């Protein structure tokens, strides 16, 4: 049975950036490569002049109604959109959304236990990189045993996901991000950082891990695409 997923993100937009954020695009590339998953994307910069919360709620509900049953939602939670997401989650449940609500992103990855108290409407939390965790959640029924995935109500191990970067499809090579008329790109050749600087939230939470580099063959192909 095909499972539907609406992947949602509210980035802080910059004029130079591609319309689809790189992290969001990487997850899209993974999910769209799987025939048993029907994935739709919803990206709306929270600082866009036309951003209206009530309109966004209506648009999300409209997309969900078209996707029909057997649909989940996955949302990346950032500090600048946390209040908006909390309001959307409450709206989803008050409008009788029955699917699973999956939350990831920095506000989840860098948080300790007690996520259920902060986001009571959510069912599942993913700490760390989301590609493989989401893919497994959407292709297997019931609860899964995946490092970094926490189900609401269960004991929280507060672990991060583990990702084999060589198995992640490239959002650039898969055409998830449109390069046309795009003079600036955000390009990922590695993930992680071996340092643990106190001022930086973008270290790997809970661990000092070595850098993980993408396979050079992928990097070469992306260079050819950009050039």
Language-model features, listed with the residues they occupy:
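Non-membrane alpha-helical structural segments and their capping/turn regions in soluble enzymes
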Residues: 21, 82, 86, 131, ...
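Conserved SAM/AdoMet-binding glycine-rich loop
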Residues: 3-14, 72-74, 98, 102, ...
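Generic structural signal for small/hydrophobic residues in well-ordered secondary structure
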Residues: 31, 105, 123, 149, ...
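Radical SAM [4Fe-4S] cluster-binding motif and immediate context
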Residues: 19, 169-227
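Glycine-rich beta-alpha loop elements in corrinoid/cobalamin-binding modules
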Residues: 40-159
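N-terminal [4Fe-4S]-dependent radical SAM core
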Residues: 2-6, 12-13, 143-189
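Short catalytic helix/loop segments, enriched in acidic residues and glycine
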Residues: 21-32
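A short, glycine/small-residue-rich beta-strand->loop->alpha-helix junction that serves as a flexible
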Residues: 12-22, 77-82
């Amino acid at each position: 049975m095909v499972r539907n997923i609406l992947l949602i993100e509210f980035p802080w937009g910059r004029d130079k950036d591609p319309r689809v954020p790189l992290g969001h695009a990487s997850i899209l590339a993974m999910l769209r490569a799987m025939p048993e998953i029907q994935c739709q994307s919803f990206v709306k910069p929270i600082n866009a002049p036309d951003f209206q919360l009530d309109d966004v709620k209506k648009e999300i509900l409209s997309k969900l109604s078209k996707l029909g049953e057997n649909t989940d939602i996955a949302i990346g939670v950032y500090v600048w959109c946390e209040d908006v997401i909390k309001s959307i989650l409450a709206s989803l449940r008050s409008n009788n959304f029955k699917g699973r609500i999956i939350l990831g992103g920095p506000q989840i990855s860098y948080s300790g236990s007690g996520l259920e108290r902060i986001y009571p409407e959510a069912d599942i939390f993913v700490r760390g990189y989301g590609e493989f965790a989401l893919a497994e959640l959407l292709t297997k029924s019931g609860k899964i045993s995946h490092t970094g995935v926490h189900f609401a109500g269960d004991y929280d191990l507060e672990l991060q996901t583990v990702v084999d970067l060589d198995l992640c499809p490239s959002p650039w090579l898969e055409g998830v991000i449109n390069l046309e008329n795009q003079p600036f790109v955000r390009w990922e050749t590695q993930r992680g950082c071996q340092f643990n600087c106190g001022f930086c939230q973008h270290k790997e939470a809970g661990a000092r891990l070595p850098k993980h580099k993408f396979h050079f063959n992928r990097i070469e192909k992306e260079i050819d695409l950009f050039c």
